[in-house]
């Protein structure tokens, strides 16, 4: 009637959810409709995990597209599973030739997500599930088996520290998901 839209929300991302719900309603019922929509989030965090590994490394533009979609759904958490498809400056072959992300690309995604109120949590592999990263000669002294790092080795701990430091420097989140997929053979090599 008056051409006024009021959206009240607690989180930035919920504004985008409210805006999209209003657009959806107006498309269905017409621009002259008067309406009130109410919605409450049932969870403190909701989101999705994108698998950007195993030759499925999404382009930065595609990640940003997912961020927009997630905002329209009111999701405030993106878990970015990169296995080893990110740069670790101290280990130049880590993630090499796999479409790995640069620190700047990851930072760009995080900056974009922040615009919508979405936290990106990096998900990396530690100790195991690192066959592709460990195939290089420069990594051979770090392996227990072809897929698993050598627990107890100081250089392995330096690698893990470098991995965590690398992804932590690209994201605002103070959380890093440390995956240990398929580590059942740890220490058996």
What name fits each language-model region?
Residues 2-189:
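Feature activates predominantly on carbohydrate-active enzymes
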